[in-house]
Regions:
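Positively charged n-region of N-terminal signal peptides that target proteins for export
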Residues: 1-4
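Bacterial N-terminal signal peptides
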Residues: 6-15
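Short S/T/G/P-rich N-terminal loop/turn motif that feeds into the first structured element of a domain
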Residues: 19-240
């Protein structure tokens, strides 16, 4: 299986690197970090992320971007900055290379309030292709996590077999404090809101065999759904 670094390097030469029609290789290697923030002006913060890559370079990330909450907000300006790493070693080491709590960049501090940071391990093969995304934070007993992930893998296969370009992911938190402790992040990603909606239309109508039974089987193992968001995500940085 190719490493996340190999995948990101390949994306550097693709015009449609973050478009859903560009078929990237899925991997469960590597890791991600997310910096959860409250942005006073999300547009200004996103523009700053695009124009100033100093923080990304400092951490050594191979790719980075943002996710802006569109529905299900816990608070106004809810979003996070994500960074991809080729190993969990690199992901965890990044926290010592750049401390966002003590950011030397006054521009960042002036437009956002940091909530917390966390590292994530993908538990199933995941395609990095940001778009319009649903993020569901769930609690699954440790004894059921293997079955949960297995059903999500089958749900992903069902979507692909039915011709849907929707990517699924399951991520386990590492060092997430009291907010993310014992939490799994489930992500479902389409290119646009309309594309996402069409998948949901077919799922609820039952008109297409799309692996929905495996999604339901996975969620039957969930003890609690902590939160459920729709987010607009994009990649803004790729390492040279």
């Amino acid at each position: 299986m190719k490493s996340l670094l190999t995948i990101i390097c390949a994306l550097m030469f693709a015009h449609s690197a973050i478009a859903m029609h560009h078929e990237n290789t899925a991997t469960d290697e590597g890791g991600f970090t997310t910096l959860m923030v409250k942005a006073d002006d999300p547009s200004a913060y996103i523009d700053l992320l695009k124009s100033d890559d100093s923080a990304f370079k400092a951490t050594g990330t191979v790719a980075a971007g943002y996710c802006l909450t569109r529905t299900g907000h816990d608070h106004q300006g809810q979003m996070f900055v994500w960074s991809a790493f080729s190993s969990l070693s690199d992901a965890l080491a990044s926290s010592a290379k750049y401390d966002p709590m003590d950011s030397p960049n006054a521009g960042f501090s002036s437009v956002r309030e940091i909530k917390y940071a966390v590292t994530w391990k993908p538990l199933m093969p995941f395609k990095l292709a940001p778009g319009f995304e649903r993020m569901i934070r769930v609690v699954v007993p440790q004894s059921d996590r293997e079955a949960f992930v297995s059903n999500m893998v089958k749900a992903q296969e069902g979507l692909y077999d039915a011709g849907y370009k929707m990517n699924l992911g399951v991520f386990e938190s590492i060092g997430g404090g009291k907010v993310e402790a014992n939490i799994l992040h489930v992500r479902a990603i389409a290119s646009t809101p309309s594309d996402f909606g069409r998948v949901l239309d077919d799922f609820y109508s039952g008109s297409v065999e799309m692996g929905g039974k495996y999604w339901l089987a996975a969620f039957a193992l969930v003890d609690k759904i902590e939160s459920d968001y729709m987010q607009e995500c994009a990649q803004v940085y790729t390492a040279e």
